[in-house]
Amino acid sequence: MSAALKLLEPLKYKAPCNPAYRAAQSVAHWHMGNITPHGGQTLPECNSSCHLARKVKNVGGTTLPRRTFTASSAHLGLEFNKASTLNASTLHPDSSSAGGGEEDVEVFDSFEGTRVFLKLRPEYQLHSYNRSDTHQPIAASEVELILHKVTFYQNKLQPEVITNYFYKLSSLPAEQNSVLLSSNSFALLCQLSVKNIQLFNTSDLISILKAFVDLRIPPSLSMLDVYETRFCHQVWEMTLDQLLLVADLWRNLGRRVPRFFKIFFSYLNLHWRELSLSQLIHLIYIIGENRQVPQDLMQRLESLILKYVDSVNLEEVGTICLGFFKSSSSLSEFVMRKIGDLACANMQHLSSHTLVHILKMFRFTHVDHIHFMKQFGEIAPQRIPSLGVQGVMHLTLACSALRILDERVMNAVAASLPPRVAHCRSKDVAKILWSFGTLNYKPPNTEEFYSSLINEIHRKMPEFNQYPEHLLTCLIGLAFSEYFPVEFINVALSPGFVKLAQERSKFELTKELFTLDGTVAIECPDYKGNRLNSHLQQETSANLWNLASKDMRSKPEFLETLYLLETMLGGPQYIKHHMILPHTRSSDLEVQLDANMKPMPFNSEATPTEDGAQLRFKQVGVSLTDDLMNQLLKGKAKRYFQGQIELETGQPPMELRKKTTVPLVNSGCNGTDRLGDGMVGLCPLAHMQPPLVKLAIQFTNKNQYCYGSRALLGLHNMKRRQLVQIGYRVVELPHWEWLPLLKRTRLEKLAYLHEKVFTSAL
């Protein structure tokens, strides 16, 4: 409450108002029609300080000669120069592209395209502003008269007159705005509005702000700071419709107003229950464009979404998703499933951009609405060719984030990209390569697809200086798919780029650099280019091990697995939990077997020492005989293991077991074991033979596979590929087998682990 009350205190601000200045040449020379000099002679050329530009016609058929003025209009930051007016016009793209065909597909008006929902309910007109609404164009003679009055009367102008002048001038045809903004008289009008700003009521302020939008006032002008401050004072005296309208006008103007929104959000914390459906949707849109919002407010708005969810249309559903996504605000799984259900009911009528917005939110919340994704897979291949590459990127990225491999979608993406790859940003190239690599999928046109994207990386190299994370994403995505463009790798691992990535990117990229470096070391033995320095390698490896170790040891199922393996093999010295390949960011359980396929006590970290000389190991392993295995593998368990073993080896389990049953005794160490009763033997570590087999036991979970399948994702598939390359045999304890077995008896678990370890060793 105290935080909210602080916002009620008046904000201190200064409205710098210089005395009204004389402007002998301040009035623009507004001329009517086709006026020519006496005698029909053409006008002589003006000098560089005041030249006639080409004439442009207004709607009424009159023309205004465009002039530039020598007098300064820098009061209050009113630098209405050519560059600023051009920039202002780009912030309000309201003209369609003259191009056609492929170009039209890539042209998306991100401003108007996200405001379609405002046209679908009449209620939105109460709290939004539509610049396309037509005004009766003002005559050039009236413009000239207004500007003359501004110059002549100056300080005698009343606030309501100033407001009226702005309103009338805002009806000027858009193509003549730059002429008006170049006028010293208009600069004087703006100065007078600032000087009298405390005399304007809320309606006046809103009217002037509308005029600023219509006239495309450059959003960077310092004059607008004064207006933001004044609106901050007015927040608690305004209605919800007025507040939303003001916020929408700032959005139309293209200016960020963080102070206004801070107070506006405080107001909403007290009045959020009063929001109507149209107000709620419009507010979520505005929040998304603002990018920042208190999360407690978003939680309140989520409850209102549930209240209105059955009344929203499809475009409003897309607006909800985009607003929450842009503001990095999550929605509950329940709400996301409701949204998915709404979309599924009308999937064919869903616009492509709304589809993209919904997928963004599914990606952000990691909600797997399978029915939605199935329907998406049916319509996406037809939509993708007519969707811009940025939209295609978001569709592809959503599939990879949700681990859903739909070959129809991926093939459509791969087929559509090569002809228009030049339209990709560096971000698009990176995310698409990452997505295909993550899903471990190679489309039918693999060669064309990858060669076009790799060539585009070359063309985008200057962009990577600004966005180094995108180059690393490209290269790691390519590595998942076994592509290693050494030219780019050499750049990415160069000292200069490493420094750039660590200093200039907003992301922590050390892990990405480490992953790329470790991958190159294994998979590119002939590579002679740049590598990370040893200090950075060791530091990153230690950090990753701390994270991986903490994560795995927080999982009870992993701890039980580790304990059972230690029991089966003979103690902690026979198994080691560590990161065999630190750059792959996950840990392993390593077991080493000698020439007789018996475990070796190689883990010195878990071995007690006596006087630093000999290492003594206690054999506490379990001898698994055929009789014991028969007792364990009865009923359902027996059928399960028998089916799995026959499937994987093609041999009946009893025949295989005769080959693989290994009594854990006499492996160079004397001693005999009983179940739970062992004797101690001496095994000097220095006399141990090199291991014949090194096993990397993988404790997996569902997030390492494509959804609903047993196909590994890119990083985990790459890790196994590299483990094999450095001489390990991978033993997988798949979650679909091992996790259900954890509920069974201890002996059944030991039997399963014995089969896995020693069958893999063959």
From Swiss-Prot:
Residues 695-755 form the RAP domain. Keywords: Acetylation, Mitochondrion, Mitochondrion nucleoid, mRNA processing, Phosphoprotein, RNA-binding, rRNA-binding, Transit peptide. One of its GO terms (biological process) is mitochondrial RNA processing. One of its GO terms (cellular component) is mitochondrial nucleoid. InterPro entries: FAST_2 (IPR013579), FAST_kinase (IPR050870), FAST_Leu-rich (IPR010622), RAP (IPR013584). It is found in: Mitochondrion matrix, Mitochondrion nucleoid. The modification N6-acetyllysine is found at residue 506. Expression detected in spleen, testis, colon, heart, smooth muscle, kidney, brain, lung, liver, brown and white adipose tissue. The modification Phosphoserine is found at residue 95. Belongs to the FAST kinase family. Found in a complex with GRSF1, DDX28, DHX30 and FASTKD2. Associates with the 12S mitochondrial rRNA (12S mt-rRNA). Plays an important role in the processing of non-canonical mitochondrial mRNA precursors. This is FAST kinase domain-containing protein 5, mitochondrial. The gene is Fastkd5.
